[in-house]
Amino acid sequence: MTTDKKSKSKSSEKSTQEVEQVIKPEKTPILDTSKWPLLLKNYDQLSVRTGHYTPIPNGHSPLKRPIKEYVKYGIINLDKPSNPSSHEVVAWIRTILRVTKTGHSGTLDPKVTGCLIVCIERATRLVKSQQGAGKEYIGIVRLHGAIEGTTELSKAVDTLTGALFQRPPQKSAVKKRLRVRTIHNSKLLEFDPERNLGLIWVDCEAGTYIRTLCVHIGLLMGVGGHMQELRRVRSGIMSEKKGQVTMHDVKDAQYEYDNSKDESYLRRVIQPLEAILTNYKRIVVKDSAINAICYGAKLMIPGLLRYEQDIESNEEVVLITTKGEAIAIGIAQMTTASMATCDHGVVATIKRVIMDRDVYPVRWGLGPKAKVKKEMIKDGKLDKFGKPNEKTPSDWTNTYTYYTGQVATTTTTSPVESMNVDTPKKATASVAVKAEVESSEDEKPVPKKEKKDKKEKKKDSSDDESEEEKSSKKDKKEKKEKKEKKEKKSSKDDSDDESSKKEKKDKKRKKSSDKDSDSEKESSDKKDKKDKKEKKKSKN
């Protein structure tokens, strides 16, 4: 019997071993975040500050926004047509999409075609960042004479790289002053010796004039030259290879949405604004801190979730939500090492807010200190900005620290003391809160008798000071009175002089009027005499 039991137990063990070998546990699936869209790409490679936060059911993923918000937070990678100006094209898109605000990422001349990033509504806040981004062009140079071979031309094109002096051409509506522009790279792609046409590719800084570059190439070749045609291939991060649309596409997409309510074409034409920001380093923010940032607050350490590696201080970064929405463009105040180690401090200041206010709920002012502060503001113990005033208790000023800087407390005095104390003494009485905090930590509670003695000493000292101040005040008053007397005298003298001048003028006027009247009388007498003589002659 015992042998049978042992054999059964051995067989059961073997069976369990076989089962363990046959049914293996499933491996945990690995998230492939490399395929996640836009700003969430490679999300798992970001450094983690904390994984604990409360997700709020607000906001939308950039690609899943409602169509009105999608258009409001959208950009268009437009292939600009040849004859209209950039401003005309942008105005046409504004009327087609029926939006209030549009902008573009750097003007193109009317005859130039190619990449023009059109920003819609809230995306216009990113126009400045895109105008300063690098550009790529492909242009045709026409030389004014024949040249021997293409090697010299390719050398001339290669030499025109780096920092160059450029003056805007006569056609441009810009002030014609000398500028410095850097050309990162340039190549000669083709050359047609029969027609003296060369095809060049240029990677340059924003604001470079390819027209003047073509003139310089002609000067280097010794035959002269000018630009025949130009096309922008890349503007910032957007190129003609991906997602470029024409004006007809925009018009058709809006027509489809208006008539058949089909959003798919409009979503294909318009891209989310996050597509422009993929080259920025990212900082992921907690949902509770988003609305404060939209109101202009700095990002502090408690609001930080994840951050990119190799962030340096004073570097431009993009602040994003856990859903991948862009909140703002900020300037990093910490490196990645300090973000990982610091317990408090400012992570980034805000350069440009992108997201609308109140998309996420207000989550500030909910802590215990904030509630006490609100009650004190209601009771009048703090002013409307939450800063101390006359009624603030000393416990509050001694314990509460103001992170916005030094805050001066206004102190009041009794009417008797205010008679004795001068204004500069009042100014010295207002002390910064930090200084009060330090002094209060060192001081111990003082008994009442000592307080009375101190008050009496202060009164005595104030009496001594008041006597000196009174004497100084008297001197000042006397000086003022003397000055006033002098001013009155001078004003009287001036008035006397003016009155005398007026009298003289009146006398002159009277004399002149008397003379005029005498002369009139004489002339009338002469006339009468003449008339009498003529009458006598006529009688005779």
Swiss-Prot record:
Record-annotated active site: D109 (nucleophile)
GO terms (BP aspect): box H/ACA sno(s)RNA 3'-end processing; DNA damage response; mRNA pseudouridine synthesis; response to mercury ion; response to oxidative stress; rRNA pseudouridine synthesis; snRNA pseudouridine synthesis
SUPFAM superfamilies: Pseudouridine synthase, PUA domain-like
Pfam families: DKCLD, PUA, TruB_C_2, TruB_N
PROSITE patterns with a match to the protein in the record: PUA (PS50890)
Assigned protein family: Belongs to the pseudouridine synthase TruB family.
Function comment: Plays a central role in ribosomal RNA processing. Probable catalytic subunit of H/ACA small nucleolar ribonucleoprotein (H/ACA snoRNP) complex, which catalyzes pseudouridylation of rRNA. This involves the isomerization of uridine such that the ribose is subsequently attached to C5, instead of the normal N1. Pseudouridine ('psi') residues may serve to stabilize the conformation of rRNAs.
Name by which UniProt lists this protein: Probable H/ACA ribonucleoprotein complex subunit 4
Organism: Dictyostelium discoideum (Social amoeba)
